[in-house]
C-alpha cells in the first residue's frame, strides 16, 4: 500500500489525478465534454459534477448534478441544460462556506466520494486534503 505525506507534492499528485480523471471522463463521454466546456467559463471557483453522471449510472432521464464552490452564472448554466435537453441541478456554496464546512456538512461527503472536477482542481484538492 502506498501513501503520500501531506504537503505540496502530495497536493500536486492529487491535482494531477483529478485532472487525469477529467480527461478520461471527457474521452468516455464526448457529449458531456462539450457541455462541460460551455459551463466551465461560467464558474468562478470549483465546479464539480457528482451523482449519476459521475458514477456512471446516468440514463436518458437523469439530470446533471453540479456543485459549485464559489460563484457561477446560474441562468446561463440552466439555459445550457435546456439547449442540450436535460436539467442541470445546481448546488452552490460560497467559497468561504465550502472551505469552512467541507468536513462537517453532511452533504459534502457525497460530492467528495464520487465526482468529476470540471474546473478549479487545485483549490478543491487543497481544501479536501485537510
Regions found by a protein language model. Give the residues of each.
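Catalytic core of pol beta-like nucleotidyltransferases
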Residues: 1-45, 54-61, 69-130
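Glycine-rich beta-strand-to-loop/alpha-helix junction loops that act as flexible
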Residues: 50-52
Amino acid at each position: 500500500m502506498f501513501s503520500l505525506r501531506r504537503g505540496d507534492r502530495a497536493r500536486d499528485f492529487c491535482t494531477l489525478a483529478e485532472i487525469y480523471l477529467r480527461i478520461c471522463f471527457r474521452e468516455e463521454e464526448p457529449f458531456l465534454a462539450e457541455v462541460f466546456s460551455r459551463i466551465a467559463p461560467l464558474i468562478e471557483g470549483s465546479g464539480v459534477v457528482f451523482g449519476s453522471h459521475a458514477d456512471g449510472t446516468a440514463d436518458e432521464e437523469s439530470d446533471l448534478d453540479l456543485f459549485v464552490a464559489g460563484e457561477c452564472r446560474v441562468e446561463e448554466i440552466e439555459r445550457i441544460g435546456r439547449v442540450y435537453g436535460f436539467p442541470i441541478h445546481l448546488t452552490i456554496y460560497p467559497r468561504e462556506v465550502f472551505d469552512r464546512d467541507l468536513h462537517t456538512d453532511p452533504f459534502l461527503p457525497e460530492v467528495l466520494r464520487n465526482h468529476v472536477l470540471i474546473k478549479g482542481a487545485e483549490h478543491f484538492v487543497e481544501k479536501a486534503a485537510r
